[in-house]
Amino acid sequence: MSTPLDHIRNFSIVAHIDHGKSTLADRLIQSTGGLELRDMKEQVLDSMDIERERGITIKAQTVRLKYRANNGEDYILNLIDTPGHVDFAYEVSRSLAACEGSLLVVDASQGVEAQTLANVYQAIDNNHEIVVVLNKVDLPAAEPERIREQVEEVIGIDASGAVLISAKTGLGIPDVLEAIVHQLPPPREGDATAPLKAMLVDSWYDAYLGVIVLVRIIDGVLKKGQTIRMMGTGAKYLVERTGVFTPARINVDELGPGEFGFFTGSIKEVADTRVGDTITEDKRPTAQALPGFKPAQPVVFCGLFPVDAADFEDLRAAVGKLRLNDASFSYEMETSAALGFGYRCGFLGLLHLEIIQERLEREFNLDLIATAPSVVYRLLLNDGSVKELHNPADMPDVVKISAIEEPWIRATILTPDDYLGGILKLCQDRRGIQADLSYVGKRAMLTYDLPLNEVVFDFYDRLKSISKGYASFDYHLTDYREGDLVKMSILVNEEPVDALSMLVHRTAAEKRGRQMCEKLKELIPHHLFKIPIQAAIGGKVIARETISALRKDVTAKCYGGDVSRKRKLLDKQKEGKKRMRQFGKVDIPQEAFIQALKMGD
């Protein structure tokens, strides 16, 4: 039996990291009886260990809640919990496209942050009704009135009816439920008799059921036994079970218009289910597909290599399994003279990279080395063709290239006034171009255009340390612009080390090269011969350090004696060292790679 449309509410919770949206989701589940108290744990919807530990949401999750409103009517509330971090913005955009309304959660002590803005504008673009919720009003530092004004001033939406809550203590939760029912709209359309039309919101892999596909039904009915077709890929599947999450997985007979639920159907790989695809019945297809999403494009690339070459097979299996669940993560095989076999992987951003690396190390027990992260450059070649470059080591000969373009981002930074000077200097040092500076209460809102390759290294860490952790940062890619970029190679004993080569801006090349050489000098152990470490652009060396040789005192056995005798022994030693240097191999310890790639400023 499908629920009537006007008794369904589909909504998501939009907030900056740590403003308490997963805790609010917990309270909503608890107060509508979605889980028994004994099953309650904090952040019920953050199912990965790493999500709970870092206190962040990575995968969007959904829950169906039954709620009896004060007017005595029963409603079905479908809550979609979304990530707040900029790297997972595409998870947010998918979730928002599947809903009609949003709860905007703002911390009553901290106010509007950079990602609050980014996510709220996405919700407004999707024509969402927005209910403002001020959380953490029980904190001594909470200033609900000031924050209410701030929301109206910065975002431009009416916050006079904002709901004041404390998700931790449960204060004000009934008011939130009433606001969802009375202020958010029901699904806009939906005809149970029309051909099936459903939107694929997410999918993940289950060891027993194969791929579980999360869908939002627009028209028609999805039930067991139907043969469905994915309109994007043309693939057909037989539906084996349909169900909903409450958050426990519960099978139901059918899913009707406006509802959220899941189905399984012997789908082997998550890559077969494209997010944003339209699902329809094979026998009676819908005439018009839904406007799809752009697939998530990897922004940052880096090489992942096992510390022990024998673990390569395990790494191969592990990246394959992770790809099952994370369609935005891409990889291809790569070999490096210094590090052996590994994979060149693409990520949505640095947090995504860190999380994938941590999941590989944790869930699959691997020890990994990550090479320096790089972005996707566009090379305009002399013959008029355009080539994308993911790995600086693969750069063609300079004479073939007419120009190099690099990706630029538009960054929004919110910071307390006291730290503004330091942050402006940081952005300036990173070749930033200031686009705007305005004030939100006592905080400055900066808009900067920055090259992504300057942000990838350690911009976020520097920003946090300059602002003592108070600044927040959000960005989106804007375009590609031509830059004066050069490939810097690192040579150890006159042999280039491919894993350490990088593309840098010509003005920063010397500083970067010097830092790298100094760092390697500390990290590579002394050998019996002298080792030069050089940073070079093409054939021109721009920085050099030398590791001195270990030497034996060959003149120790001459008691006083004749100077020509000593000379002879020293010259003989010198000759040997020279020959040794010609044929000697320098062993660079793995530790040195790991440390050298952690560049500081």
UniProtKB/Swiss-Prot annotation:
InterPro entries: EF-4, EFG_III/V, EFG_V-like, EFTu-like_2, G_TR_CS, LepA_C_sf, LepA_CTD, LepA_IV. It is found in: Cell inner membrane. Residues 6-188 form the tr-type G domain. Keywords: Cell inner membrane, Cell membrane, GTP-binding, Hydrolase, Membrane, Nucleotide-binding, Protein biosynthesis. It is an enzyme of class 3 (hydrolase). GO terms for biological process: positive regulation of translation. The keyword GTP-binding applies. CDD domains: EF4_II (cd03699), EF4_III (cd16260), LepA (cd01890), lepA_C (cd03709). Pfam families: EFG_C, GTP_EFTU, GTP_EFTU_D2, LepA_C. Coiled coil: none annotated. GTP binds at D18, H19, G20, K21, S22, T23, N135, K136, V137, D138. GO terms for molecular function: GTP binding; GTPase activity; guanosine tetraphosphate binding; ribosome binding; translation elongation factor activity. The keyword NAD does not apply. One of its GO terms (cellular component) is plasma membrane. It catalyses: GTP + H2O = GDP + phosphate + H(+). HAMAP family: LepA (MF_00071). Belongs to the TRAFAC class translation factor GTPase superfamily. Classic translation factor GTPase family. LepA subfamily. Required for accurate and efficient protein synthesis under certain stress conditions. May act as a fidelity factor of the translation reaction, by catalyzing a one-codon backward translocation of tRNAs on improperly translocated ribosomes. Back-translocation proceeds from a post-translocation (POST) complex to a pre-translocation (PRE) complex, thus giving elongation factor G a second chance to translocate the tRNAs correctly. Binds to ribosomes in a GTP-dependent manner. This is Elongation factor 4. The gene is lepA.
